């Protein structure tokens, strides 16, 4: 959800039915969805909507076990720095664009959820098991 305030600032909202990303994960760039949307809004990338500063990145809990429905968690410290976020995302894209770059299915095992609905697409079980894997 994109909210453009009367003061000319943006609030970027994600409705969550599951776990809300931690403040540390958002700040460290591990969870980038709202930051990408904020960058687009700040730079005027949404058609027919003006650019402007981002005042808030919020996750609204609408159901789930982690938080009570209705909880709103802000994930922005101070002001949104569009220039540094753009640089971070461009560096990240360049790293993935490098043909010499590997693409691990689980780059940080501490961040892997217990439920992995797309694990079969990464073939990670096959790689862990070696050549004798059969499904």
Show which residues each predicted segment covers.
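RecB-family 4Fe-4S metal-dependent nuclease core
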Residues: 1-135
């Amino acid at each position: 959800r994109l909210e453009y305030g009367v003061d000319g600032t943006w609030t970027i909202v994600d409705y969550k039915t599951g776990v809300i990303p931690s403040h540390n994960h958002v700040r460290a760039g591990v969870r980038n969805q709202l930051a990408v949307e904020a960058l687009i809004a700040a730079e005027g990338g949404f058609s027919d909507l003006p650019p402007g500063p981002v005042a808030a990145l919020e996750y609204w809990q609408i159901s789930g076990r982690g938080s009570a429905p209705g909880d709103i968690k802000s994930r922005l410290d101070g002001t949104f720095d569009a220039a540094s976020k753009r640089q971070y995302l461009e560096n990240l894209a360049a790293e993935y664009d490098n043909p010499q770059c590997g693409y691990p299915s689980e780059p940080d095992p501490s961040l892997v959820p217990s439920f992995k609905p797309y694990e079969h697409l990464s073939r990670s079980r096959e790689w862990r098991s070696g050549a004798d894997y059969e499904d």
